[in-house]
Regions:
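Histidine-centered phosphotransfer motif of kinases
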Residues: 1
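Hydrophobic aliphatic residue packing
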Residues: 4-7, 59, 93-95, 100
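Phosphate-backbone recognition surface of nucleic-acid-processing proteins
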Residues: 6-84, 88, 115
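Basic, amphipathic alpha-helical segments enriched in Lys/Arg and hydrophobic/aromatic residues
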Residues: 83-118
Length: 118
């Protein structure tokens, strides 16, 4: 997958041995990319991400920035979210979550990356 380099690969191997053994929701929560709600009183609909494995999330953030440029599938996903006036950080977090769930599925199913043809 474009955007996944040696730094991300080694980080995932070392700090996320559960990759490929969990569901997409579980792996997103484990990394800290699942939004949690803190609704109370007037604060409704505000979601944030927190917790999880910070070193994995930090490296995944930089990989997502690279993938938004060079991975055609994620580039289209990024532009689609930007067209709906999402905030830039929200878009990057969505790309991060898509990357980790895709990598999780690839390891679970033991398949190589196959870019979608246009």
């Amino acid at each position: 997958m474009q955007g996944v380099g040696p730094t991300l690969a080694f980080t995932l191997i070392a700090l996320l041995p559960e990759l490929g053994q969990m569901s997409r929701k579980q792996i997103a929560a484990l990394v800290g990319l699942a939004p949690y709600d803190f609704d109370s009183g007037r604060l409704k609909g505000h979601r944030c991400i927190y917790g999880g494995r910070l070193p994995v999330r930090n490296v995944l953030y930089m990989a997502a920035l690279s993938a938004c440029r060079y991975n055609p599938a994620l580039k289209v996903f990024h532009h689609r979210l930007a067209a709906t006036n999402k905030k830039p950080k929200v878009i990057i977090v969505a790309v991060m979550r898509k990357m980790i769930t895709t990598l999780n599925a690839m390891l679970r199913d033991n398949v190589a990356w196959q870019p979608k043809s246009a």
